[in-house]
């Protein structure tokens, strides 16, 4: 399974318009494309950062959709009042585990990291055996995912929790897990963000 993420930064005051556009126009169009297995959208209402991720059954389906998705992305940038500092990345969905569906008010903690590309499988095994069992024990746990780029060693891990209170409750626990990942897995943590999960239409099967 594969995923394409689009990260933009725009005017926080236009965020509701951007959410409505993705919900009412982008998602209906994307879900009819061959191989699409879902779409999610996360937002930081303070900074205006917004991440839209589409999921695909295989690499071929993801790449075949690129030309049709491009004008929607351009329209989203214009509608959101975003600058041209957008980032589009393609990922392998390495880990996906659900505890229960995310409801209204769900939030996500997103961690970007980089490791040795040559040790990708070893790092994934460490994540599954060492970190995942403790992540799913966090209060309010809904789901977690790990997307990887095997070529450059980048990864993005997302933990979805029931609400903002649970984000605050687990902040220290998450910090300790990141430190353990740095120590045991030898990864570099590039960025961490706490965001609202505003759309979650995912039919991606679990990998755990």
Predicted regions and their residues:
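Short S/T/G/P-rich N-terminal loop/turn motif that feeds into the first structured element of a domain
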Residues: 1-50, 57-208
